[in-house]
């Protein structure tokens, strides 16, 4: 029996829950529960409320998803970018 294809969707993180779980609203308006994938946890990629993410969902359970990518912000960050550090 072949493995079913995963559905890939995009959404915005609404709420950060305990145990690296998140409440995400998809682009179509549906709210789902999601967890961070192992790769995201391994590399300690921080996901905050308001972040745009890509989820994978199983066609059998459309209430849960796995976050496998956090999109970079289009807005500039508040921290200065590489100020030509000089070692003394």
UniProtKB/Swiss-Prot annotation:
Family: Belongs to the IF-1 family.
Keywords: Cytoplasm, Initiation factor, Protein biosynthesis, RNA-binding, rRNA-binding
Example of a GO MF term: rRNA binding
Lineage: Bacteria, Pseudomonadati, Pseudomonadota, Betaproteobacteria, Burkholderiales
Complex and partners: Component of the 30S ribosomal translation pre-initiation complex which assembles on the 30S ribosome in the order IF-2 and IF-3, IF-1 and N-formylmethionyl-tRNA(fMet); mRNA recruitment can occur at any time during PIC assembly.
Gene Ontology cellular-component annotations: cytosol
Localization per record: Cytoplasm
UniProt superkingdom: Bacteria
Domain S1-like: 1-72
Species annotation: Bordetella avium (strain 197N)
Free-text function comment from the UniProt entry: One of the essential components for the initiation of protein synthesis. Stabilizes the binding of IF-2 and IF-3 on the 30S subunit to which N-formylmethionyl-tRNA(fMet) subsequently binds. Helps modulate mRNA selection, yielding the 30S pre-initiation complex (PIC). Upon addition of the 50S ribosomal subunit IF-1, IF-2 and IF-3 are released leaving the mature 70S translation initiation complex.
Cystine bridges: none
Principal subcellular localization: cytoplasm
Designated name of the protein: Translation initiation factor IF-1 2
